[in-house]
């Protein structure tokens, strides 16, 4: 007896089963089987990143060194995330520490003054190599994170110095973090990072600078933290999932397109040069067969003599009657020859549109706007420019918070510990916790970098004033958007007002208006009080 077959329900195409057709198409063969050959392996981040880690970073380095758009992308990160001065805004958690707000503000003023003296010293005492100020180190860290996906800073102690502070920092290239003797990865040592069973980093293997390459390479193990909790080696990157050991550079998703765009630009430039080389051509009556006989039969003695003789006749003729394009004389050509002037041709041929399409794709992968990446602001309205700038600003603020500020805060904590021990700054006496007991509370701070790009200065100021007047923002926030510290602005305004008054100058319009408004308001309050009485 034949077993009956159960009919299978098919999808609208009459071939795919309804169960497969009704599911997620991304996991199937796709429309027309277009996804059938696309079978990427399911891997962890380390499994996908670390086998080709060195090559990927080397390619990113090459792009930044030799590709203008890649170099501009790194410059955008530095200018918009950090700017020219990375300013400390110290904010100890005074409620948690059990101190008063005024005590906390007084302590913060002492800390900020001492930190600026140490961090922005023109002698670069903060840097082991004596090449960088603190802001320069943050700018380098942001650039390093962009094209290497991570940044490393080593906190050191200068025992031979006679300076007040012994804390120093060394910027460490990610290229120097690798397994000892370039051995393969293991469960607890991956790409130069020693980790515990939970995946937390315990220490790092740092190789010496191998240039010029004739000395044997040596590795030094540096712990992540010292026994007292002080940071010894700072490693900042943004993991995308659990178990990730090293960071992935921002160019991975657009690396192929950037390299091909480089090749395309070079080819287009060569084509334009070739077209511009020939202003005119002379065509001879020599037919194709005779020309091929000359070329293909040049190995025989007879053909070589014929070819040499023919070229000699042409050379002798034009030597006696040269062809000139810049003169007024109309030249006489050799009988049978014709002069063809080459008109200028369009070397673009749709290239600009194609380049814009590629640059938009690259800009999306790098997190910046097309206009910023290409430096092309033509045909943009105010609304379009503002929307584009706001999108990039949100990206840059995220990077400032999770990359630049993390590096800066950990460096600041190392210095603050020494400043407290040396009594350069004094903790409030009524504090509930010591520095070692509440490092994060004492070192809590914000960092003010470059301001948001102003598309229309007048409209930006009007917006800030309206937000403050409506109670939706504060002077602190609006000044921070412009890259300024509101306390410094207020203090400077007071000084300038007093100096103008001492010099017999009128106060600025805003100050006069504010004074009149305050006087009018106080007068009205006095009148209302008198009526009530």
Curated annotation (Swiss-Prot):
GO cellular component: viral portal complex
Subcellular location: Virion
Gene Ontology MF terms: DNA binding; structural molecule activity
GO BP terms, alphabetized: symbiont genome ejection through host cell envelope, long flexible tail mechanism; virion assembly
Known function: Forms the portal vertex of the capsid. This portal plays critical roles in head assembly, genome packaging, neck/tail attachment, and genome ejection. The portal protein multimerizes as a single ring-shaped homododecamer arranged around a central channel. Binds to the terminase subunits to form the packaging machine.
Protein name (record): Portal protein B
Main location: virion
Family of the protein in this entry: Belongs to the siphoviridae portal protein family.
HAMAP family assigned: PORTAL_LAMBDA
